[in-house]
Amino acid sequence: MTTAQHEGEQTVAAAAKIAMSSVAPSHRQGGSTRALLTPSSVGATSGFLGHIELAPGESVTEHYHPFSDKYLYLIEGSLVVRVNGEEVRLERDEALFVTRGQRHRIENRGNVPARVVFQISPLAPRPELGHVDTEPVPNPAAAPPKVGG
């Protein structure tokens, strides 16, 4: 990480690079989620960027973000995103915006892996407040993606 400027007492990076392979995936909600550019990894202050990979038949369980909007960009495969129970089909090179507080579930009903890049912003006041599960997660003993702290 290169330091070029200061914001108050916090050092802010002018640029920071993270290899996806260097970030351990979380399987807590289903699929494979990696929080890439985060407050803890690069000092991000306004949101964070991540990657989700879902094998055919996998899904990310329903949840919502009380403080944040979610931006999704599908780079491979196809997905069904259920937003408040309504299905939105997402194909490769399509993007979806989910406003804060909306319940959403991400499903790969296709026969090839799906890969999606997501951005969540603004940040919640504390990482543990930023995500609320609304259905049981398939791997409750697994750690959530590391965003802060």
Curated annotation (Swiss-Prot):
The yes or no answer to whether the keyword Transferase is present is yes
**GO molecular function, one example?**
transferase activity
Q: Which InterPro entries match?
A: Cupin_2, PKS_Associated_Protein, Polyketide_Synth_CurC_prd, RmlC-like_jellyroll, RmlC_Cupin_sf
Alphabetical keyword list: Antibiotic biosynthesis, Transferase
Say which domain of life the source belongs to: Bacteria
Query: What Enzyme Commission number(s) does the record list for this chain?
Result: 2.3.1.235
**Pathway, per Swiss-Prot/TrEMBL?**
Antibiotic biosynthesis; tetracenomycin C biosynthesis
Signal peptide, first to last residue: none
Q: Where is this region: Disordered?
A: 127-149
Give the catalysed reaction(s), semicolon-separated. Answer: 10 malonyl-CoA + 8 H(+) = tetracenomycin F2 + 10 CO2 + 10 CoA + 2 H2O
| Biological process per Gene Ontology, one example term | antibiotic biosynthetic process
| Traits of the deletion mutant | Deletion mutant can still produce tetracenomycin C, but at a reduced level.
Ranges for domain Cupin type-2 come to 51-117
Purpose of the protein? Involved in the biosynthesis of tetracenomycin C (TCM C). Part of a type II polyketide synthase (PKS) that catalyzes the synthesis of tetracenomycin F2 (TCM F2), a precursor of TCM C, from malonyl-CoA. TcmJ, while not absolutely required, greatly increases the tetracenomycin F2 production. It probably acts as a cyclase.
The subunit structure is:
The tetracenomycin polyketide synthase (TCM PKS) is composed of a ketosynthase complex (TcmKL), an acyl carrier protein (TcmM), a cyclase (TcmN) and a probable second cyclase (TcmJ).
Q: What is this protein called?
A: Tetracenomycin polyketide synthase protein TcmJ
- Give the species: Streptomyces glaucescens
